[in-house]
């Protein structure tokens, strides 16, 4: 015992710091990824809160027409947002010291770039920290793999899409109505609803919600009764107990009779793998779709593809979507474009008579 105490005393300050950082006995695990995660996420969160409350209007389109996004400049929780960095900045790295003054930095939307870049670094480190803690505890690494789906989605809308479009001004605004505006403009310019990767993402999110609700309700409904009929089944259990609290055979039998036998899992591991993989793979595909549409590889275009024997167009749902896309296209950034791209691309009629 004495030798152990002496060895601890002789350990260097750096060694003690390393042991503290990587200790799984801390109430919250820090880890080496946490050393980078904590300051980046604190910075992103602090600047977001300050900018959401008090940032002045931002010249998002680079045409000297600032757009207000903060609460003190007339917005509420729904309409407020951190306005993306100006199109005049493009993809340039724009820290505070690159601007002539803080006022110029705010006018050009510097906070957006600061928040987004720190946030992406922070969530990537959070993913690494999940792996690191799993490694220290001897667990398998799939928690971090599952978290890679939302990380990929955030990276797609905040970094890959602006890179593909040539400006951070095309990134998703950090606010509720700003997110909706981003979605509408994305549909107008890329026809995302007709992209198969987006369809897979919808199936992943809605299917994941359905399977989660089905699984949770089925487990809760098939508890092994440890009590009498006169008291709650909840009284028969204690939090964190080692014994199984529900009967998977009973759940399998119920679900197999409700639908059909092979629609029900009789193996808990394969069931939970399915519950994790379904939404994760769907969101991976959506992030991949956003990242390809960033470079204008857009959704399917079936416009005016059905005609009768006389060559007259028979409108399909695709044509209705196309008309809606044109309407959204001409309305967004209305002062920045003399000719919206979709309309300007049409060949002008001949005037030679």
UniProtKB/Swiss-Prot annotation:
The modification Phosphothreonine is found at residue 2. Chlorophyll a ChlzD1 binds at residue 118. Pfam families: Photo_RC. GO terms for cellular component: chloroplast thylakoid membrane; photosystem II. The record marks 161 as: Tyrosine radical intermediate. Photosystem II (PSII) is a light-driven water:plastoquinone oxidoreductase that uses light energy to abstract electrons from H(2)O, generating O(2) and a proton gradient subsequently used for ATP formation. It consists of a core antenna complex that captures photons, and an electron transfer chain that converts photonic excitation into a charge separation. The D1/D2 (PsbA/PsbD) reaction center heterodimer binds P680, the primary electron donor of PSII as well as several subsequent electron acceptors. Tyr-161 forms a radical intermediate that is referred to as redox-active TyrZ, YZ or Y-Z. Its EC number is 1.10.3.9. Changing residue 264 to G: In strain: herbicide resistance. It comes from Amaranthus hybridus. Residues 345-353 form a propeptide. Keywords: Acetylation, Calcium, Chlorophyll, Chloroplast, Chromophore, Electron transport, Herbicide resistance, Iron, Magnesium, Manganese, Membrane, Metal-binding, Oxidoreductase, Phosphoprotein, Photosynthesis, Photosystem II, Plastid, Thylakoid, Transmembrane, Transmembrane helix, Transport. The lineage of its organism: Eukaryota, Viridiplantae, Streptophyta, Embryophyta, Tracheophyta. The keyword Cell membrane does not apply. The modification N-acetylthreonine is found at residue 2. This is Photosystem II protein D1. 2 of the reaction center chlorophylls (ChlD1 and ChlD2) are entirely coordinated by water. Herbicides such as atrazine, BNT, diuron or ioxynil bind in the Q(B) binding site and block subsequent electron transfer. GO terms for molecular function: chlorophyll binding; electron transporter, transferring electrons within the cyclic electron transport pathway of photosynthesis activity; iron ion binding; oxidoreductase activity, acting on diphenols and related substances as donors, oxygen as acceptor; oxygen evolving activity. It is a multi-pass membrane protein. It is found in: Plastid, Chloroplast thylakoid membrane.
